[in-house]
């Protein structure tokens, strides 16, 4: 379900049922989707798919939530003539005047911050986290309904597009027991990816798997090949987890989609490159898990520069999750104007626009510190078009006072408590609205 969890009744719900034929011959599948109950009156979709051996297909429908307020479940039923398979997902729809539910539904979770400068106040703490500490942190996120976990990256490699990195000589260090490359990050946890997923399974949460880092802003053919190999390994190792929700491409991009190239020809080439990357990566991931969405985070600057490319890109990118609306350059359009432009192009493409809310501010030395809760609440109320709001990030910015380890400064606890108070007030407002 896109988006999952709690949503407003002002959006459309994207429902996808993915099927992979693991048999040796062509197979016919009867596929049905139901709302709440498995009966004819609750049927959303009923179709037949013929899928060749080792191939995949997906059933996809979008339905408005206007009259669906309340807690519901969506049932997928698949029959191959011999066996019947069922999957059920729950959804909560709240009454609202706007698309946003005005709360943070999840957060980035960097296993080690990519920048020692930015992560100055927590990298030494996060390094000490064991697998059990990661499980504890996932429970803390669940406590404040941040039920979507975006793993920032599964390899650490500090390089930018234009570096001479290749698939074969890639020097990055893995956060998990990868068989692709020997390098390992020097952290206490043995397999934090498994710890995060297994705990998220128990809590009914969703994990967006960060396929990266090859090199920042790099969507070249070399980067594409690396991403395919890593995505395949991640799916083979962790795809059995119920919480494995999506593939997230870690590389990020500027809002202009041209990598800030001043030369018109180079700018055009970068735009062609990013579209080709996601076209190929989407096709590759669909063969593994056809229902899984793919997400990219872009910044909100220079959005008008990319408007000639977004329609084509969004054919292959399910979720666009931009950041930086609160710090737009003076020469750019406003954050609200950028959000409205992106919402329009996503609506036209039947793609999803989520919000990567920045829960941090920069110190003079460029280290990050928790943003005051009042500023976060301001953003939650200002940008009301986003169907789902995630934040950057949980570790080092929020800290549950009941956790056995503190990652970062003491004021991270204040932000956790402040957000918890806001959440209680929001729930009360929603209850009285009913």
Annotate each predicted stretch with a short phrase:
Residues 144-187:
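Aromatic-lined carbohydrate-binding/catalytic grooves of carbohydrate-active enzymes
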Residues 64-69:
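Short, surface-exposed loop/turn segments at beta-strand-coil junctions that are enriched for proline
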Residues 107, 126-159, 313-320, 383-389:
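Catalytic domains of carbohydrate-active enzymes, especially glycoside hydrolases
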Residues 217-289, 329-337, 366-374, 400-411:
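Active-site cleft segment of glycoside hydrolase catalytic domains centered on the general acid/base Glu
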Residues 149, 245, 324-331, 348-433:
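Substrate-binding cleft of secreted/luminal carbohydrate-active enzymes
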Residues 205-226, 246-252, 271, 277-307, ...:
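Aromatic-lined carbohydrate-recognition surfaces of secreted/lumenal glycan-active proteins
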Residues 130, 137-140, 187-203, 220-246, ...:
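An active-site-proximal structural segment forming one wall of the substrate-binding cleft
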Residues 90-126:
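An acidic-aromatic substrate-binding cleft motif
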């Amino acid at each position: 379900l896109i988006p999952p969890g709690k949503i407003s009744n002002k959006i459309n719900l994207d429902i996808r049922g993915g099927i992979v034929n693991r048999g040796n011959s062509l197979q016919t599948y009867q596929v049905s989707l139901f709302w709440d109950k498995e009966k004819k009156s609750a049927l959303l979709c009923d179709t037949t798919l013929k899928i060749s051996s080792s191939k995949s297909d997906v059933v996809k429908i979008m339905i408005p939530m206007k009259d669906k307020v309340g807690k519901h479940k969506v049932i997928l039923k698949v029959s191959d003539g011999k066996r019947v398979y069922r999957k059920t997902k729950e959804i909560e729809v709240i009454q609202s005047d706007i698309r946003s539910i005005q709360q943070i539904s999840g957060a980035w979770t960097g296993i080690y911050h990519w920048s020692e400068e930015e992560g100055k106040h927590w990298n030494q703490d996060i390094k000490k986290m064991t697998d059990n500490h990661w499980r504890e942190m996932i429970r803390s996120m669940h406590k404040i309904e941040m039920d979507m976990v975006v793993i920032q990256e599964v390899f650490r490699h500090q390089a930018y597009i234009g570096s001479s990195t290749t698939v074969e000589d890639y020097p990055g260090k893995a956060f998990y027991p990868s068989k692709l490359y020997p390098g390992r990050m020097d952290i206490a946890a043995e397999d934090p990816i498994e710890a995060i997923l297994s705990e998220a399974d128990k809590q009914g949460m969703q994990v967006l798997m960060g396929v990266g880092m090859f090199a920042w802003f790099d969507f070249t053919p070399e980067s594409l090949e690396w991403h395919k190999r890593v995505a395949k390994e991640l799916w083979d190792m962790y795809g059995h987890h119920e919480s494995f929700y999506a593939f997230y491409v870690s590389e990020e991009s500027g809002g202009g989609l041209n990598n800030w190239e001043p030369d018109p020809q180079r700018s055009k080439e970068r735009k062609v490159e990013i579209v080709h990357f996601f076209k190929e990566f989407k096709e590759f991931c669909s063969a593994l898990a056809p229902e899984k969405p793919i997400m990219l985070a872009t910044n909100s600057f220079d959005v008008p520069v990319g408007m000639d490319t977004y329609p084509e890109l969004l054919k292959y990118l399910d979720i666009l999750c931009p950041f930086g609306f609160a710090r737009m350059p003076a020469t750019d359009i406003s954050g609200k104007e950028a959000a409205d432009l992106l919402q329009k192009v996503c609506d036209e493409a039947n793609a999803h626009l989520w919000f990567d809310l920045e829960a941090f501010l920069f110190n003079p030395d460029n280290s990050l510190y928790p943003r005051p809760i009042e500023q976060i609440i301001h953003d939650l109320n200002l940008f009301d078009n986003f169907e789902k709001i995630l934040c950057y990030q949980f570790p080092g910015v929020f800290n549950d006072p009941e956790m056995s380890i503190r990652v970062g400064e003491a004021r991270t606890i204040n932000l956790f408590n402040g957000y918890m108070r806001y959440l209680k007030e929001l729930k009360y407002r929603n209850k009285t609205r009913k």
